[in-house]
Amino acid sequence: MIRNPIPWPNGARCAACVTFDMDADSLIHIAYPDDGHSRVSAISMLQYGPRVAIPRIVETYRQLAIRQTFFIPAWCIEHYPEAIETILRGGHEIAHHGYLH
């Protein structure tokens, strides 16, 4: 039992933290440094996050009036600036997640 419980606002009993890692296709380039660019199927699947999922997540969180933290490698920031702008326009935080994961 906690002797000095944390006083959460509005009578809440706890808090939750939701974060997203946006690694995109940086994972392919780590696993296959010499020919990662040629693995079209895997790259296509991993590009779904920054191209489709990020706008949907940001819009859902806008509707719920929730802000969150996205952990993103610098490589992804360089390659997906539109996703980064979408996140920032939504008022969300971007946290460092290495350069290439």
Report residues per predicted region.
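Catalytic alpha-helical scaffold of carbohydrate-active enzymes acting on polysaccharides/glycoconjugates
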Residues: 1-101
